[in-house]
Design a protein with these regions (language model features):
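Signature of N-terminal electron-transfer/Fe-S-associated modules in redox systems
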Residues: 1-151
């Protein structure tokens, strides 16, 4: 199997790993970098559990070939301040937790780009993050609290 040297910034730290040429960013993060907060839900880019920020943009890491992250900045749920996740949890945003990392990363991006909500509703924006437990009301309330700065 062919391999290549992948260098990128992960949660503010420069790293280099030798990975298979067909590796997904998700696998590099979980198995080579031990960022296990990034979850694989569907493996097809439909559920959002594997969402990370790649050069500041939310992406489903299960769909990103690892080589596309070469020279980029990747931010995972491990980099998010505990207070940020605590705000989401305080509203009952998650139950089983499988979707939580992706929701946190999407909410993190949205908190930095609230102007997006002038173009679309919060519920519509979060539709890329599937949750089988909550019925979404808690998710929407939690993300709204984080984005708007409510307690």
């Amino acid at each position: 199997m062919d391999k290549f040297e992948l260098s990128f910034t992960l949660n503010g730290q420069d790293i280099t790993r030798t990975v298979p040429t067909d590796a997904r960013l998700l696998d590099v993060l979980r198995y080579d970098c031990r960022c296990t907060g990034t979850k694989e839900g569907c493996g097809e880019g439909e559920c959002g559990a594997c969402a990370v920020l790649l050069d500041g943009l939310p992406v489903n890491s299960c769909l990103v070939p690892a080589f596309q992250a070469d020279g980029c900045c990747v931010e995972t749920v491990e980099s998010i301040a505990r207070e940020f996740a605590a705000k989401l949890n305080a509203t009952g945003t998650s139950q089983c937790g499988a979707c939580t990392p992706g929701i946190v990363m999407t909410a993190r991006w949205l908190a930095d780009h609230p102007e997006v909500l002038g173009q679309t509703s919060l519920r519509e924006f979060m539709s890329g993050n599937l949750c089988r437990c909550t019925g979404y009301d808690g998710v929407i309330e939690g993300v709204d609290a984080v984005v708007s700065g409510k307690k």
